[in-house]
Amino acid sequence: MLLFDRDGEYWVILNKRTQKVEHHKGEICFPGGRKDMLDKDLTETALRETWEEMGVDPSNVSVLGILGKTETTTGYEITPTVGLISYPYQFNIHNDEVEEVIEMPLSCLFLKDTRRYEAKLLEGEVIVQPAFHYENNMIFGATARILNNFACLIDSRNLEEPA
């Protein structure tokens, strides 16, 4: 999870995936991917994947910490690493993987117009989970759960519960 400070407000970087990728085509996500055998830990994996997908030099990222694990419906386990980069940053995206870079203010995680709760049928059970709508993009699934967990760490008092 890449963050940056723009005029005293923190923003998060998200990617819109292309239609060329194998999984989660067109979905909004964080840069990231699978751990390689050469990666010494998951932080190194996050930095390597961010370099490969977005051209963000690992030396330009100040790692702030690691969030709790989140599972996807496709069986992946995500361990989000939070890092800070300077703004503006000149991204060099991998066009086969990233269609668009989305910059979203963290304040959107707390706004009624942005924050939703979506019901989804999963293996015969209705699951209600957070989703975020920002600039004609719907952020849902594991990405929305990670953002929601991060918002709770920032300030849970400003979050609304589902009706």
Question: Which role does the model predict for each range below?
Answer:
Residues 1-30:
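N-terminal strand-loop-strand
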Residues 2-3, 143, 147-150:
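Buried hydrophobic packing segments
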Residues 20, 34-135, 139, 149-163:
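Unchanged
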Residues 27, 33-34, 142:
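Gly/Ser/Thr-rich helix-start
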